[in-house]
């Protein structure tokens, strides 16, 4: 069901999508509503309020509504910005990643003081071989999709300030705040959803290597008519299992509801990734387990729960382990080596 609250209309410039969270926490609901109300007062903005992005099926009324929009989008949700972008992409709402001036980690930085990266030594990075990504071969439409994470800020005015920046609008002065409000329309889409768990592929990183389809034994992955990887049966995925994300060579597989930021879609490439607790970067247990061993164990747990036999680290995973061990060190390896060299 769709309900609409219409104000004085102007020519539409941009659509803001506010995705409600799964929680009924009154503070979170209050933040959502405040963003809706403030954004709805900006000239040239239409607002659509939908249920939680990740829980919506592909056939949902919400996604059908969003597919009809051709221009730029600003999407505000409770999952990491990167995760939100690729949830939309897999459901047919495609575009290029819009650049924002603040990140998912802004609030965490303000609360925690200096980051690990600020104290880390400079690291020489060896050039890596250029590899074609799926979006290099199949470019997305030439429009911008800006995704903002509600977890990053608790002041609705910050979101609206970023919206105005994206639109190229100046902040309202004290002389204009009392003028009549000229906004767009606010559309609320009401539909029932249930909590889901499935992988989301970041095609800006994916190289179509097929490691995930070879690893997953639950029929989650498939290929399209162009032999590109896709999440074919999302609801076949075992709830709580992120094992395939650990074996992905490009960190292209996202589980938006996972507790580990790197798996949930936080940006971890480059120095900004080192702000995350390195010992828990991929949510692995403390100890000597590598991501491949952890992935194999998680897969076996789900196989046993499904009444099937465990397979452990098979020949393909052993080869992957040996390739990783023989390969050049990455930025994380170099950082850890540098930290170990400190005289502390």
Language-model segment annotations:
Residues 49, 83, 149, 155, ...:
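Poly-acidic low-complexity segments
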Residues 61, 88, 95-96, 106-110, ...:
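Charge-rich, low-complexity amphipathic helices
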């Amino acid at each position: 069901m769709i309900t609409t609250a219409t104000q004085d209309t102007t020519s539409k410039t941009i659509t803001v999508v506010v995705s409600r969270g799964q929680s009924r926490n009154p503070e979170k609901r209050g933040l959502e509503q405040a963003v809706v109300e403030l954004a709805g007062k900006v000239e040239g903005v239409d607002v659509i309020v939908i249920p939680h992005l990740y829980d919506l099926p592909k056939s949902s009324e919400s996604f059908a509504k969003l597919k009809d929009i051709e221009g730029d989008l600003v999407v505000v949700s409770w999952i990491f910005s990167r995760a939100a972008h690729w949830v939309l992409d897999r459901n047919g709402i495609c575009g290029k990643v819009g650049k924002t001036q603040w990140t998912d980690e802004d609030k965490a930085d303000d609360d925690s003081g200096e980051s690990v990266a600020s104290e880390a030594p400079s690291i020489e990075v060896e050039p890596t071989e250029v590899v074609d990504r799926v979006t290099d071969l199949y470019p997305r439409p030439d429009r911008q999709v800006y995704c903002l994470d509600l977890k990053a800020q608790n002041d609705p005015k910050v979101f609206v300030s970023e919206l105005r920046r994206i639109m190229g609008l100046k902040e309202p002065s004290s002389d204009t705040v009392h003028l009549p409000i000229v906004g767009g329309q606010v559309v609320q889409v009401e539909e029932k959803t249930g909590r889901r768990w499935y992988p989301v592929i970041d095609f800006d990183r994916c190289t179509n290597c097929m490691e995930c389809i070879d690893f997953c034994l639950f029929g989650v992955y498939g290929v399209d008519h162009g032999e590109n990887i896709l999440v074919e049966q999302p609801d076949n995925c075992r709830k709580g299992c992120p094992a395939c994300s650990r074996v992905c060579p490009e960190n292209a597989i996202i589980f938006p509801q996972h507790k580990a930021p790197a798996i949930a879609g936080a940006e971890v490439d480059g120095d900004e990734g080192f702000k995350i607790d390195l010992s828990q970067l991929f949510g692995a247990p403390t100890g000597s387990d590598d991501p491949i061993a952890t992935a194999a164990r998680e897969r076996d747990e789900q196989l046993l729960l499904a009444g099937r036999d465990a397979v452990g680290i098979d020949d393909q995973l052993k080869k992957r382990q040996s390739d990783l061990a023989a390969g050049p060190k990455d930025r994380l390896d170099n950082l850890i080596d540098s930290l170990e060299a400190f005289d502390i």
